[in-house]
Amino acid sequence: MGKLTALDNIIQAAKASAAELSEVTASAGHVPAHTGFPAPGEAPDHILVRGDNNAVMRQLLACGYGGAFQCIYLDPPFLSGADYQATVRIRSEKLGEELSVKVPAYQDTWTDGKGRGGSEEGREAYYKMLAENLVLARQLLADTGLLWLHLDWHTVHYARVMLDEIFGEERFLNEIIWQYKSGGSTKKHFARKHDTILVYAKAADYRIHIDKEKSYNRGLKPYRFKGVEEFEDETGWYTLVNAKDVWQIDMVGRTSAERNGYATQKPLALMERIVKASSEEGDLIGDFCCGSGGFLEAGAKLGRRTAGCDRSMLAAALAEKRLLDGGYPYQRYDMDAESLPEGSDGDFTGQDSLLGGLKPADRTMLQRIASEDPQALVLFETALPDGRRRKVDVFGRETVISCTEDA
């Protein structure tokens, strides 16, 4: 079977599955009790879910969010065949110790039970995931809404074919090239220094805001045509023109204050530009592969309402901390809850999966910090409605502390 034929079969299956969901939701006539999400008009400004994005989008549709999103940004795995790590930094002032350890962030290897990433079975599993998410995202979008799909050279060519089929070729708006300086190089091919973001509209009457950028193509001489407003800075004379489809924005540097250690973290400047281009204050926007929450923070900062999810404990915790630190009202939901026992401060044992890849010295130090200064492992705390406190540690694990334990 040819690849395009296989892709078409995957797309048609995804459409059929989404259509079946729409029929079930419509025939029910009410929000299923198990969904747990508030109705669109009753939701807080920001919703964050820990769970599989396909399941979360289906639940949102079941709760009446179809057509509610003005913008959806998707930054899925790229089918790179690699497993990614996050850097977790721990500082114990009590012990005078600092520790930096690498822990699993997410896997970008794919299997359907027969093969791994790179195999035909693995590729088919990946494209099945992508097609289903794109179909669901389209259903969540408003008629004036835009989808932004962020990929790279591994799969963007096949994703374009998918989007043409799901949204329609006539709904393609742009292929944004995000150009950056970071990354390696090799003698085997030209250095790869960009990602690609495909932009599609749901319908013909879409909304988009094109920003302006400086154009210095006249050197130091002022423009001589009447009616053209020109400006001067230290570089020379320039006019303001509609922005182009190549965006030069640096990656988050290793020493940047913005950096939180999560693998493949995207810069806030890139996220803010997408938010501004595709939405207005008060609009609902979504990121259903939210990672450490950069898009959600950008949206909240710019006055948008947001909804996002990630299946990783660590990613969801980092995204929540962004909202918490910014003082933005949000509600956190867990579809894949994995909490520590009530009252536990997160003691680490030799069997703990988090310790498996650590060096012996790092493992010993982490166990010592957990034993003698457990508060150093706390990323943040929140109060629960019943008066208990919820603690989230630097690895994204959760525990609940009752009021009596503080007495």
Report residues per predicted region.
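Accessory, often C-terminal, charged low-complexity segments
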Residues: 1-41, 45, 54, 61-70, ...
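Short glycine/proline-rich turn/loop motifs
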Residues: 37-41, 102-120, 249-260
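Short catalytic-loop micro-motif centered on adjacent basic/acidic residues
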Residues: 47, 146-150
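Cofactor-binding loops of NAD(P)H-dependent oxidoreductases
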Residues: 51
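Conserved proline-anchored active-site loop of SAM-dependent methyltransferases
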Residues: 67-86, 163, 285-299, 308-309, ...
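Short strand-turn motif at the edge of the Rossmann-like AdoMet-binding core
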Residues: 77, 151-153
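Extended, hydrophobic alpha-helical segments in both membrane/secreted and soluble proteins
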Residues: 130-133, 147, 159, 266-275, ...
